[in-house]
């Protein structure tokens, strides 16, 4: 079942990591509660989603409570991850609503001494060019939202990556860095993005589960 698959994925991550630093998982509490418990104090970086899957405008998991008070129960070494589907061309009303939700969650993370990861995927909300992701990032900074981590789609040009890095470094010298998401893309396409991103120290790693194990998981 899906719960056993989550446990197997965690076992694989722990086996590969061994005693080395720099490995981690993304795991939600609805399907992966046992894996989250097991991952505690293992040294793995643990990102835990807070969004209601697929929501646009953004909605947060009801389990967090109306004031996100349940975050006080999260272990301090878990990173609060939220995915916001947004695009520079979104109308004012949509931006306002999504900004309000993201800012409330960001502030709740600060109150509870939890790191905050903001994931944005503009390509799922409209056409993109080399400035699109950078403009989205700037929009959140303009609203005094300073994520500890950014999770960004695999950009394919030097210009797009340079614009993103400039936007982050211009606004926040203390951000932890960037994690690249996979979107289920081919290894070839991700490799092209990684080869560019590897030139920037701000890019810390990637989370591309479907590309790595989707076929195996389906067969299993």
What are these regions, as identified by a protein language model?
Residues 119, 150, 209:
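Conserved, mostly hydrophobic/aromatic
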Residues 17-67:
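Active-site cofactor/substrate anionic-group-binding motifs, chiefly glycine-
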Residues 153-220:
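Catalytic-face loop-and-helix region of soluble metabolic enzyme cores
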Residues 23-26, 47, 77-86:
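N-terminal substrate-binding region of glycoside hydrolase catalytic domains
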Residues 2-3:
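Short, small-residue-biased leader/transition segments that mark boundaries at the very start
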Residues 29-33, 50-54, 84-88, 120-124, ...:
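Active-site-proximal loop/turn and secondary-structure-junction residues that shape catalytic pockets
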Residues 8-17, 39, 64-79, 94-95, ...:
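Alpha/beta enzyme core
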């Amino acid at each position: 079942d899906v719960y056993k698959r989550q446990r197997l994925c965690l076992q694989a991550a722990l086996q590969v990591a061994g005693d080395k630093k720099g490995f981690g998982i993304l795991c939600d509490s609805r399907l992966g509660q046992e894996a989250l418990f097991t991952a505690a104090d293992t040294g793995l970086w643990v990102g835990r989603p807070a969004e209601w899957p697929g929501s646009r405008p953004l909605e947060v998991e009801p389990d967090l409570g109306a004031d996100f008070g349940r975050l006080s129960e999260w272990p301090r070494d878990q990173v609060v991850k939220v995915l916001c589907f947004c695009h520079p061309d979104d109308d004012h009303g949509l931006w306002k609503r999504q900004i309000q939700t993201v800012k409330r969650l960001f502030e709740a993370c600060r109150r509870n001494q939890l790191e905050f990861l903001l994931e944005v995927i503009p390509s799922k909300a409209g056409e993109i060019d080399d400035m699109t992701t950078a403009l989205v990032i700037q929009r959140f900074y303009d609203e005094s939202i300073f994520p500890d981590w950014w999770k960004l789609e695999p950009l394919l040009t030097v210009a797009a990556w340079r614009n993103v890095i400039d936007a982050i470094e211009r606004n926040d010298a203390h951000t932890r860095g960037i994690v690249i998401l996979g979107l289920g893309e081919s290894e070839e396409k991700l490799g092209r993005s990684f080869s560019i991103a590897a030139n920037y120290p701000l890019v810390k790693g990637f989370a591309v589960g479907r590309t790595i194990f989707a076929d195996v998981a389906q067969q299993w």
